Amino acid sequence: MISLLAVAVLAGCSNPETRSQANRGFDYEQETLRTAPLLIPEGLQAPRFNTEYVIPKGTAQGVTGKVLDIRPPTQVLPLVRGSEAMTEGSGLWFYQQRLDQPLERELNQALTVFFEQTDTDYDAVANGFESSGDAIGAPSQQFRWQLMPDAVRRAVAVQVQSTEGGGVLAQDRLRAEASMLNAFSLSYQRELSRQQELLDQGPIALTLDAGQGLLLAEQDYDRTWKRLITLLPRLGFDISNRQQALGYVDVEFDGLSKGDWQDLRLPALDIPEQEYRIQLGDLGSRTSLSLSNKDREPVAADVLSKLVNTLAPAFERTDLVR
């Protein structure tokens, strides 16, 4: 038990984010350069010395010893896709990615979620928030969060500033600002990932356009691609090649047993067991899917009709993509 406690204590002391003082002695601060005059034996002349490169005596600049903070600097990290660190101050630029709501409102909501998840006291003020915070490796401080929209860049900056007085060192203030901003950025990225996961698992409507000889998915290209790649193996297709950038999937249909279709609670897919290519087309908010045989010839209308009878309810089922 004692050994475990010792390990825990040592691990805590060796944390580079919190240990600001070196773990060696500081006797070197009292040391001086010892010099002695050159002794010239009797009968010899003293050598001539070049005095051009003599190091002058001067006062020591900067901190040393126990006062020297050895912690690595904390850097503002753009953890969210479409974000960029500001060139001045502790802040991040976030660029508009979604069109369903204004970015400034979205960031306001994200900051509120961040404060509530971390049990942080906060108040809404003009163009931002004021909050308390305990940053890693820095004393507890008060912070001012400011949102600065830029209509030209279609972006909003989130800048955080420590509002503590002169009792906090400048290096601790900068470290705390960067640490708090990184914590918010990580929280925001997690929330965006959660929302993306919900969207990816949501139902997608799939219909047949008999006139064009293709299927239409009421979702964008990326989500339709993910849904298709997830479902194909479950529906009896072996994927032999896929190229998302080129928009096609090469498969071979091996079929499923009657019992497997009953377990899936889907209409059985009764098409020839052979090689196919599924070609996707990006239509903005919708995606087209066409089916061809191994010779890259469009399949018959009845084959496409049978495919949509099975694939459409599968695209609607959220339990099949979890």
Curated annotation (Swiss-Prot):
Residues 1-22 form the signal peptide. Keywords: Cell outer membrane, Membrane, Signal. One of its GO terms (cellular component) is cell outer membrane. One of its GO terms (biological process) is Gram-negative-bacterium-type cell outer membrane assembly. It is found in: Cell outer membrane. Its main location: membrane. InterPro entries: BamC, BamC_C, NlpB/DapX. Disulfide bonds: none annotated. Part of the Bam complex. Belongs to the BamC family. Part of the outer membrane protein assembly complex, which is involved in assembly and insertion of beta-barrel proteins into the outer membrane. This is Outer membrane protein assembly factor BamC. The lineage of its organism: Bacteria, Pseudomonadati, Pseudomonadota, Gammaproteobacteria, Aeromonadales.
